[in-house]
């Protein structure tokens, strides 16, 4: 088998190095996880879930008025 020896000019070497660096950087970059912004309704649902987990009654106890 013949081995092919490829010789680069200095400019080509620089271009090859730049390509390799770009490839490495692109591999390192992770795509950010796309999430939708939370609406007020979503936040309320999360609070309700947390209250259920903690054993608190569902609902807003701050606004409940009791008659004496």
UniProtKB/Swiss-Prot annotation:
Disordered: region residues: 1-68
Basic and acidic residues: bias regions: 9-34
Compositional bias segments (type: Acidic residues): 42-51
Protein name: Putative uncharacterized protein DDB_G0267218
Native organism: Dictyostelium discoideum (Social amoeba)
